[in-house]
């Protein structure tokens, strides 16, 4: 995909071996699912891909992080990092899932497996209905807004241009 992977600690040997194993095996059947489940924390990967798509995080290619303990039987896990290009109004109707399937080698391998696709759909639906339910998110945003509102003035004094990005609601409340 033209993206260089940076190793912060350890090496890519185990990761590349996992990709090679999945690429070399027919992973779309039941045995493929057993192989997938033995190598990765499936829920961790689904959460990572789902949030990337849900947030329309256009910088996903160079903002992926994963890790695995160096012990027998450990599985690959994923982290959510750097969503600075996520939840951007200009990308609100953008579908990144096609891009992820096309350019994210591991995801493109996994979607060949029916069990993975079903788990992905079920976990994504659960996130939409629970984790990202509108009232739940509104309550979280409101509670965080109350915590940080006293810092808005200091932030604007230091980074005055960011005030241009504020909503009219914030301006109406005297924050800009």
Language model regions located:
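Middle-to-C-terminal accessory/interaction subdomains
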Residues: 1, 6-168
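Single conserved hydrophobic/aromatic residue that forms the stacking wall/gate
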Residues: 166-176
């Amino acid at each position: 995909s033209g993206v260089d992977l940076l190793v912060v600690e350890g090496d890519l040997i185990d990761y590349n071996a996992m990709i090679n194993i999945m690429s070399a095996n027919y992973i779309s059947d039941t045995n493929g699912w057993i192989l997938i489940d033995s190598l990765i924390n499936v829920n961790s990967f689904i959460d990572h891909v789902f949030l990337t798509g849900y947030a329309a995080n256009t910088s996903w290619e160079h903002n992926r992080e994963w890790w695995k303990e160096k012990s027998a039987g450990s599985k690959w896990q994923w982290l959510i990092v750097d969503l600075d290009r996520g939840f951007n109004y200009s990308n609100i109707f953008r579908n990144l899932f096609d891009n992820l399937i096309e350019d994210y080698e591991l995801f493109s391998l996994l979607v060949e497996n029916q069990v993975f696709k079903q788990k992905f759909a079920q976990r994504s639906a659960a996130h939409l209905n629970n984790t990202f339910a509108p009232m739940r998110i509104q309550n979280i945003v409101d509670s965080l807004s109350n915590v940080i509102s006293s810092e808005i003035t200091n932030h604007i004094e230091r980074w005055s241009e960011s005030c241009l990005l504020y909503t009219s609601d914030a301006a109406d409340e005297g924050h800009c």
